[in-house]
């Protein structure tokens, strides 16, 4: 039901139905909470058990037979599991100009390593005894190439086990945070700029 409200909120926003978009987004939020700063200060975004995920594709280990494990989203986006990304060094990275525009006070800046191959998110990871920023330069033949500057470290591996060859992990389709943004935008565009601003800031 929440996902249906969320879908309608998206549609109403696109159609400039501001009041309906705000109402539907608020309904979609019912029963869900936002991720905290601590929640997003470690690799994650791989589990439908997240309190902010309203709708997700559930992708379990049984759904990833050995000959298909590299073609999952985890095999392409996660920088901590055995897959195309790590074995070939095809890490998803952010442009340095965009990275430098993110304020140092924004926790999301840690979702990528910096030019010195560091991120506070790495402090939460252990790859066969290699921890913290040392993971960046870790190279294992046919398993992991060293990280490049601005590599993404946002997504955790399956069961948070670095080096796993099970590239399962749930795929988020709708989050509570998106609904808050829709609600705030719809309120502001509908003439209640102060209400939308207050909703975002509080």
Model-inferred region functions:
Residues 2-41, 54:
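Aromatic-residue-lined binding/catalytic grooves and analogous aromatic/hydrophobic interfacial grooves
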Residues 17-23, 190-198:
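Structural helix-adjacent loops and short alpha-helical linkers that scaffold large soluble proteins
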Residues 27, 33-191:
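Elongated scaffold/linker segments in the mid-to-C-terminal portions of large proteins
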